[in-house]
Design a protein with these regions (language model features):
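Helix-loop junctions at membrane interfaces in 12-TM secondary transporters
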Residues: 55-69
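Loop-to-transmembrane helix entry
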Residues: 3-19
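Helix-to-loop junctions at the C-terminal end of transmembrane segments
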Residues: 23-37, 122
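A membrane-interface helix-boundary motif in multi-pass transporters
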Residues: 120-138
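Structural signature of the two symmetry-related core transmembrane helices
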Residues: 40-55, 135
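Loop-to-transmembrane helix entry/capping segments in MFS-fold secondary transporters
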Residues: 6, 93-103
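Transmembrane alpha-helical cores of Major Facilitator Superfamily
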Residues: 14-18, 47, 70, 101-109, ...
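Intracellular juxtamembrane helix-capping segments at the cytosolic ends
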Residues: 78-91
């Protein structure tokens, strides 16, 4: 057990929040290279998520958790802006709100059950097994992303 204090845990999320605000310019050149291809953007982000969980699975001290959070945050900056955009592109006319609601509901379910299921894995096995489990889920997400057929139509206009 690494015995991370509540204060240290809070620092991890503070790093995450600050990075989301200030590190956007660091990923802008990569987003430019991806030329607005949301599928590629999500692919890059998921690979970065996997890297963060791999690094963190070997954590023996708080510093490695900080490194893992920094890597994870870069993954977030690629994936999470793309998800509602794709939902909007996939939604039939008049159903955009319903699709956005589904995206938000899925995120909420993840926040509700993720810590519980992660805790079960840690209690039953160990931290490394939990991170391996998360990487397996991300491989599944990559497979789904690879078979996902992009909507090649023009983006929908949102009426004011």
């Amino acid at each position: 057990s690494i015995n991370i204090s509540m204060a240290q845990y809070s620092v991890l999320w503070t790093i995450n929040g600050i990075m989301i605000l200030v590190a956007q310019p660091l990923i802008k050149p990569i987003l430019y290279l991806l030329k607005g291809n949301l599928k590629k953007q999500m692919f890059v982000g998921i690979i970065i998520f996997m890297l963060s969980f791999f690094v963190t699975s070997f954590a023996e001290n708080f510093t490695i958790f900080v490194v893992g959070m920094i890597i994870l945050t870069f993954g977030e900056m690629f994936v999470w802006p793309a998800v509602p955009t794709i939902a909007n592109q996939l939604a039939p006319d008049g159903k955009q709100g319903q699709y956005q609601g589904f995206v938000n509901s899925a995120a909420t379910v993840g926040k509700a059950f993720g810590p519980f299921l992660g805790g079960v894995l840690v209690d039953a096995f160990n931290m490394r097994m939990m991170f391996i489990g998360m990487m397996v889920l991300l491989v599944f997400a990559l497979i789904l992303l690879m078979v996902f057929k992009e909507n090649n139509t023009q983006p929908k206009k949102i009426d004011a």
